[in-house]
Structures are given as C-alpha cells and as structure tokens.
UniProtKB/Swiss-Prot annotation:
Keyword Secreted among record annotations: yes
Protein name: Brevinin-1R
Main location: secreted
InterPro entries (alphabetical): Antimicrobial_frog_1
Tissue expression per record: Expressed by the skin glands.
Function: Antimicrobial peptide.
Cysteine pairs bridged by disulfides in the record: 18-24
Native organism taxonomy: Eukaryota, Metazoa, Chordata, Craniata, Vertebrata
Length: 24
C-alpha cells in the first residue's frame, strides 16, 4: 500500500515542479 503511494508521489512531484518552475 505505502510503496505504491510513494512511487505515485515520486512520479507526480517532478512534473509539478516542472510546471511551477518551468525547469524541465
């Protein structure tokens, strides 16, 4: 359960940072 959420967060966070900072 937890590892799946952790992987999801690890996958989503970089895209959020990319969208906010425009650094991709």
């Amino acid at each position: 359960f937890f590892p799946a959420i952790f992987r999801l967060v690890a996958k989503v966070v970089p895209s959020i940072i990319c969208s906010v900072t425009k650094k991709c």
